[in-house]
Swiss-Prot record:
GO terms for cellular component: extracellular region; extracellular space; membrane. Residues 1-21 form the signal peptide. InterPro entries: CXCXC_repeat, Cystine-knot_cytokine, PD_growth_factor_CS, PDGF/VEGF_dom, PDGF/VEGF_growth_factor. Disulfide bonds join C116-C158, C147-C194, C151-C196. Sequence repeats lie at residues 227-242, 263-278, 282-298, 306-317. This is Vascular endothelial growth factor D. SUPFAM superfamilies: Cystine-knot cytokines.
Length: 326
């Protein structure tokens, strides 16, 4: 009888150890999968940021709420007569944005100036035409347009896509001098279109130069241990810590960049109106507070305001003093 119970206990303990081992292995595989997924997200974001060719594209990837504001400011830039009340209202609504709008404007102007495009430059005529050393021109150089500027990837170069030829009147002089300088027409290539094009075989991913990084050494007296699903190994503390204390790269909380940070919890951003508006409208018989979006019953009316010698504003349920022009 005792032998049978011993055998049963041994079988039960073996089963428990087997289940625990499977659970630990499953958590380890899940942690590795999560880390790979985080790296993939980071690499994809890095590629998108590197490929951004305008400030608008960069903001759209990195800070979506500033991108919305930037689009609005571009839309409002043509409106010169914006009253001070409206301007103050908007500056309050956009107080949570990450970048200053004026700074973005300066950066955008600088970016546009450095884009790949035809630029006026000076070229040496003799070198351009491949003339011999005993022939030279006066003036020796002419102004033409050539492609120049920066591209957004290391594997491409700013190159011309269309060319025209312009004629310049110059003096051609040969040595030894046998006659007076001759006035001749010279045709010089003038770039009219430019584009960032690959200089060689294109790889699926652009080569990214990085500084050499020394792998982080584990100074813990014992090797890394497997941690529970909601925890990670911390090399500095030599123990398992909660993911909130030591999050994986790319998994940090970026909720402050989302729409609630820009407009508040009860509002959403209206790109057409270029301002924050309430998410849910109030029923027809209630008035909506413009700041906290709460619904309330209007106590004022046209009659009550007339008795106070004031003007009734139905949208805000407020009585306003008459403004009489002189």
């Amino acid at each position: 009888m005792y032998g049978e119970w011993a055998a049963v206990n041994i079988l039960m303990m073996s089963y428990v150890y087997l289940v625990q081992g499977f659970s630990i292995e499953h958590r380890a595989v899940k942690d590795v999968s999560l880390e790979r997924s985080s790296r993939s997200v980071l690499e994809r974001s890095e590629q998108q940021i590197r490929a951004a060719s305008t400030l608008e594209e960069l903001l759209q990837v990195a800070h979506s709420e500033d991108w919305k504001l930037w689009r609005c400011r571009l839309k409002l830039k043509s409106l010169a007569n914006v009253d001070s009340r409206s301007t103050s209202h908007r500056s309050t609504r956009f107080a949570a944005t990450f970048y200053d709008t004026e700074t973005l404007k300066v950066i955008d102007e600088e970016w546009q100036r450095t884009q790949c495009s035809p630029r006026e430059t000076c070229v040496e005529v003799a070198s351009e035409l491949g003339k011999t050393t005993n022939t030279f021109f006066k003036p020796p150089c002419v102004n033409v347009f050539r492609c120049g500027g920066c591209c957004n990837e290391e594997s491409v170069m700013c190159m011309n896509t269309s060319t025209s030829y312009i004629s310049k009147q110059l003096f051609e002089i040969s040595v030894p001098l046998t006659s007076v300088p001759e006035l001749v027409p010279v045709k010089i290539a003038n770039h009219t279109g430019c584009k960032c094009l690959p200089t060689g075989p294109r790889h699926p991913y652009s080569i990214i130069r990085r500084s050499i990084q020394i792998p982080e050494e584990d100074q813990c007296p014992h090797s890394k241990k497997l941690c529970p699903v909601d925890m990670l190994w911390d090399n500095t503390k030599c123990k398992c810590v909660l993911q909130d204390e030591n999050p994986l790269p790319g998994t940090e909380d970026h909720s402050y960049l989302q729409e609630p940070a820009l407009c508040g919890p009860h509002m959403m951003f209206d790109e057409d109106r270029c301002e924050c508006v309430c998410k849910a409208p109030c029923p027809g018989d209630l008035i909506q507070h413009p700041e906290n979006c709460s619904c309330f019953e209007c106590k004022e009316s046209l009659e009550s305001c007339c008795q106070k010698h004031k003007m009734f504003h139905p949208d805000t349920c407020r009585s306003m003093v008459f403004s009489l022009s002189p």
